[in-house]
Amino acid sequence: MMARNIQAPATSSMGRLFDAMAFWCGFDGVAGCEGHAAMMLESWAAAVSGEEMPGEPYEWVMHEEGGLLELDWRPMLKAVDDDLLRGVSRGCIARKFHESLVNLAFDVAERFSLDRLVLGGGCFQNAFLLEGLAGMAQSRRCQLSLPQRVPCNDGGISLGQAAAVVRQWKG
């Protein structure tokens, strides 16, 4: 089905990456609710202290072409696979994954000389991720903005998309 692109749409959703990472780390596939796999990944990450985490957070590769920035997660997945083969615990892998996302957000902000990150999407309901972003924002003197009047999850994504289009139109 995937080879023929049947019921296998392309996606850029960070939520799907959280799901994939949770399954890769051993989530059993029985989801009791939307986001269940991602919530398990968050709980595994939160159960591990920074001192227990072997090595650095995973690396992402950024490619810019034609004014678009592509975030290549393949090197990160290779490193996760290496950790799994070495027997690194799923909690440590989950923590390194979360910390890599925090680093990625600020690497992108730095690349574009941004002093504010506007967060939206269901993955920002993840307290562990938000705490990491808040800590890094303070040390980097960067402001974080979260939705106040619209939901942070998928219900609010369209507003962010509309704002991006308006900004693009205004130049």
Where are these regions (language model features)?
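Glycine-rich phosphate-binding/hydrolytic loop that grips phosphoryl groups
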Residues: 98-99, 145-171
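Hydrophobic alpha-helical segments
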Residues: 108-115, 120, 136-143, 162-169
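A contiguous, well-structured pocket-lining segment that forms one wall/lid of small-molecule binding clefts
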Residues: 1-116, 128-138
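Conserved phosphate-binding/catalytic loops in two-lobed NTP-binding clefts
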Residues: 118-120, 127, 133-157
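Fold-independent oxyanion-binding glycine-rich loops
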Residues: 14, 84, 121, 148-149
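Short, glycine-/Ser/Thr-/acidic-enriched flexible segments
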Residues: 24-28, 124-125, 149-151, 164
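Hydrophobic, well-ordered secondary-structure elements that form the walls
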Residues: 105, 122, 159
